[in-house]
Amino acid sequence: LRDFPTTYVNRRGERVVTGFDVLLVRRDGQPEPHRTERLANGVRIWIGDPGVYLSPGLYTYTITYRTDRQLGSFADHDELYWNVTGNGWDFPIDDVTAQVFLPGNVPADGIAVEAYTGPQGDRGRDWAAEASTSTATFRTTRGLGPREAADWLLRSCVAPGGARSAVPRDRAALRGAGGPVTGLDALPEADEV
């Protein structure tokens, strides 16, 4: 299972619903059966064949999806707020690392990262981040317990509004990996959005 929130309230108090379509799910590079279920505030992806039990071990899952309305554009910055892991896990996650590649040539001092760890709504500070040209990397500094998540807020203070105008020509990717769950969640090419 992987839950993706698609409904939220923005800073102006308006209800926002984002698009979300699963394009492909893979396990260890091979297509994996999946289905989606609507939730009150999002979409749940059920992954795998319910009649097939996997042997204990490490598996890599890749979820490719299309989403929209994820970038916020403000007077002094653009931002991406992302729930990297989701909160729906019934087991602990040993560690989480996520990386975002920004369009264009954004200098490291034009990127600000803030993050939160813990149960939904918590503002835990168990994380570290670094930025380099057009790239920001975030990682947790402790494992996450069941139903805990890692969220991050990435701000680009260079050419506000540029993220929206650059997206159709460039790729922005969010990669998440964590403990027993390792995968790639991606914001696809904007011409797919």
Where in this protein do the model-derived segments appear?
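Lumenal/extracellular ectodomains and adaptor appendage modules
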Residues: L1-V193
